[in-house]
Amino acid sequence: MASKGVRLLLLLSWVAGPEVLSDILRPSCAPGWFYYRSHCYGYFRKLRNWSHAELECQSYGNGSHLASVLNQKEASVISKYITGYQRNLPVWIGLHDPQKKQLWQWTDGSTNLYRRWNPRTKSEARHCAEMNPKDKFLTWNKNGCANRQHFLCKYKT
């Protein structure tokens, strides 16, 4: 005989539908992180260079890296979240050019080709990507990896 909890979940899934049930049952993110489409995001207002930001993201476990931004909707959700905290400082993301040949890669291994480069961004000797505050964090700049900035981490739930 099914427990009351199992019966309640079955009833909820039948009445509310799978979308509502998935929101109710979605895994929780670490305290201070936010959830969007099977991922948790942590925005950190600490100043770190790009490589130290990536190492700090990895230290949180769960396969966390500097965030990959894979489509316009995800970019919009992130933008709204960050602008709730600040509107002036760039934020590191996980896109970088490790061979310094303009062959950009995501630190989490994502292969999505979505890119939102600011058309005015300079590329010489700049091999790490940041979200641009002048465009509400919806476009990206190439910047020197040694600069110390805020950063955004992401992991899959």
Curated annotation (Swiss-Prot):
CDD domains linked to this entry: CLECT_REG-1_like
Keywords carried by this UniProt record: Disulfide bond, Glycoprotein, Lectin, Secreted, Signal
Glycosylation sites recorded in the entry for this protein: 49, 62
Record-level GO BP terms: response to bacterium
GO cellular component entries: cytoplasm; extracellular space
Species in which this protein is naturally found: Mus musculus (Mouse)
Disulphide bond pairs: 29-40, 57-153, 128-145
Signal peptide: 1-22
UniProt entry tagged with the keyword Endoplasmic reticulum: no
Amino-acid positions noted as binding a carbohydrate in the UniProt annotation, renumbered to this chain: 97-102, 134-136
Protein name stated in the entry: Regenerating islet-derived protein 4
Main localization (coarse): secreted
Keyword Plastid tagged: no
Domain C-type lectin: 36-154
Pfam families: Lectin_C (PF00059)
Compartment(s): Secreted
Domain of life according to the entry: Eukaryota
